[in-house]
Structure formats: C-alpha cells, structure tokens
Amino acid sequence: IIRVLRAQGLTNLVTRSHRELELTDQAQVREFFSTEKIDQVYLAAARVGGIHANNTYPAEFIYDNMMVQANVVHEAWKSGVHKLLFLGSSCIYPRLAEQPIREEYLMSGALEPTNEPYAMAKIAGIKLCESYNRQYGTDYRSVMPTNLYGPGDNYHPENSHVIPALIRRFHEAKAGAAPEVVIWGSGRPMREFLYVDDMAEASVYVM
C-alpha cells in the first residue's frame, strides 16, 4: 500500500513499525493518534501465520488481533478520522461455503477449525467498522483479501503462509540434497492467490 501511495505522488504518509508502536496497547495508540494529524487509516496490521502458527498459538491470534482492531478503530474515531480501511481475511467464510463464495455467506456456517480464532477476530473487526459507521457516521470500510504473495513476504518456518513456506522448503531441500519434500494436506483443495501489489492498488481504490 505504501508503494502504491508513493507512486501516486503522496509524501505525507505516517507509518510505524511494530517496534515503534505496540497496537495492542491502547495508551500507545491513543498517544499516536493525539500526536499525529491523521485523516485516513489503512489498518493492515495483524498477527498472521500459517496452519502451524494458528494451531499452536490460538489465544494470541484471537487476542492480539481483536486488541489491535479495537484500539485502532476506536482511537481513530476519537481523533476525528473519518475514513479507514480494514483488511480482513477470506478465512472469515464458512469452511464448506458454496463456491464461488458470496458476501452474504458470512456467519452462515462453521469456520475452518485450524484458524477459527483468527477468523473470529477478523469477523469482529468487520462488525466493529460497521457498528462505528452506524452509530457515528464514519466511513470505515472492510475488504477481505485472499492469500497474498509478493515482495516483503515472511519466510519464517513457523508462521509463513503457503507460497513462501513452499519456496523455503524446496530451497532447503535443494540446498541440502534432500530426497523428498513433505507438503501437508491431501493436495486436493484448491487455493486462490493474489499478488500483493494488485491488492494494494485495490485497497487504495476502495479507500
């Protein structure tokens, strides 16, 4: 998103890394919004990871994401931010939803068990934006990207997503002359992937 905005000639961008601003800390988020003069917010921050991370740390996935969303949305509203874009996840839809998935399928069935806590947090983020819009007249929008890939991805073996995880496994197998590469699952499910810059352009357009 930053690359797209800069390519459009915008220079007044305010960013913070996780080390600079802990979004689960309401006091820090309140101080940030009271100090900076923000008119639009792209809420892309989240605790994310693959199947292993979601299975291992379900409490962190639901708590951290709900805290980040609640703090940013609430403090943005309190400081007068009228426009906000919340990036959710396609895992909010039921595991057995009819294909192609339609927006109205949200909360119409059971979620995928492996990432249910993360999905519940993202659903809460959507409802948070809808509730502030209804009560306070804000323009807080939600978009649900599918599996993203591209520059700046995370290749950590514990919490990477499927494409960087596979790239790392094949690279390490090649470098170590391994006789095989283990890939989880049956190989039958179909996955959808979206290039990160395409998602960024769509996010700026929706905002």
Regions found by a protein language model. Name each.
Residues 25, 40, 68-71, 83, ...:
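Conserved cofactor-binding/catalytic machinery of classical short-chain dehydrogenase/reductase
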Residues 117, 121-124:
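Active-site helix of classical SDR
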Residues 6-32:
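Adenosine-cofactor binding site in Rossmann-like domains, unifying the SAM/SAH pocket
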Residues 26-66, 75-78:
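NAD(P)H-binding glycine-rich loop region in Rossmannoid oxidoreductase-like domains
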Residues 70-115, 141:
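Conserved Rossmann-fold NAD(P)-dependent oxidoreductase catalytic core, especially the SDR/UDP-sugar
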Residues 96-105, 130-207:
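NAD(P)-dependent short-chain dehydrogenase/reductase
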Residues 68, 72-76, 128-129, 202, ...:
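Hydrophobic positions on the long internal alpha-helix
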Residues 16, 41-47, 84-90, 143-145:
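SDR active-site strand-loop-helix element
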